[in-house]
């Protein structure tokens, strides 16, 4: 998944 700082669920995908 792409880095998504707007969605806590996807926030973990951010470096």
From Swiss-Prot:
Which keywords appear in this protein's UniProt record, sorted alphabetically? Answer: Cardiotoxin, Cytolysis, Disulfide bond, Membrane, Secreted, Target cell membrane, Target membrane, Toxin
- Report, as the record phrases it, the tissue specificity of this protein: Expressed by the venom gland.
Q: What is its main location?
A: secreted
One GO CC annotation: membrane
One Gene Ontology biological process: killing of cells of another organism
Q: Is Nucleotidyltransferase set as a keyword in this record?
A: no
Q: Does the keyword Membrane apply?
A: yes
Q: Tell where it localizes.
A: Secreted; Target cell membrane
Q: Quaternary structure per UniProt?
A: Monomer in solution; Homodimer and oligomer in the presence of negatively charged lipids forming a pore with a size ranging between 20 and 30 Angstroms.
Name the family. Belongs to the three-finger toxin family. Short-chain subfamily. Type IA cytotoxin sub-subfamily.
- This chain belongs to the protein called Cytotoxin 1f
What organism is the protein native to?
Naja atra
